[in-house]
Amino acid sequence: MKILVLSDSHSSMRFMRLCVSKVKPDVIVHLGDHFDDGEALNEEFPHIRFYQVAGNCDRYRTPPHAREILVMPIGGVRFYMTHGHIHHVKQVLSLLMRDAREAEADIALFGHTHMAYCERETDGLWVMNPGSCGYNRGSAGLIEIEAEKITSCRIDRRAHV
């Protein structure tokens, strides 16, 4: 299973479409800023499972069903998804990691900083920020799952995945 992770699109639809066309993911995750970009992408690719959370720039543009945190299994792996602003990820990652561990997540996904990051902690928790796919930064994350385990977790910063 391939999961495409996007964040901080800030109305940059072209790169997101390119990623979806190239990767052909089974699942798309959009981590906020801008929520309506995610909704538009979901409408363009309705056959692909889609999850998204709201970011700090989405305060006045999100529907009532929008969430700031989603915790759920995908492919047998437990995901903790948030934009990150409520965890103050520009200063520290410890609050995000604490909440992800309390939720018994296998991987924590966040955005907000526009800086790509992907590491596996000593206790096995994966932590990923795909960077910004907006502002011509061209950064995205790709997670691969086989047999209910993460087999690959990587960032691509070259405007294609």
Indicate where each model-derived feature is located.
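Pre-active-site segment of Zn-dependent metallo-hydrolases
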Residues: F15-C19, M81, H87-A100
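Charged helix-capping and loop-helix junction motifs
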Residues: H65-I69, Q91-D99, L125
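Active-site environment of divalent metal-dependent phosphoester hydrolases
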Residues: H10-R14, F35-E39, C57-T62, H87-V92, ...
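Helix-adjacent hinge/juxtasegments
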Residues: R49-K90
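N-terminal active-site segment of His-dependent metallophosphoesterases
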Residues: M1-H47, D58, T62-R67, G138-S139, ...
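A short helix->loop->beta-strand "cap" motif at the edges of active sites that frequently abuts
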Residues: P46-R49, G124-L125
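Binuclear metal-dependent phosphoesterase catalytic core
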Residues: F15, I74-G75, R101-E104, E121-T122, ...
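Active-site neighborhood of phospho(di)ester-bond hydrolases with catalytic His/Asp-centered motifs
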Residues: V5-S7, V27-D33, Y51-N56, Y80-H83, ...
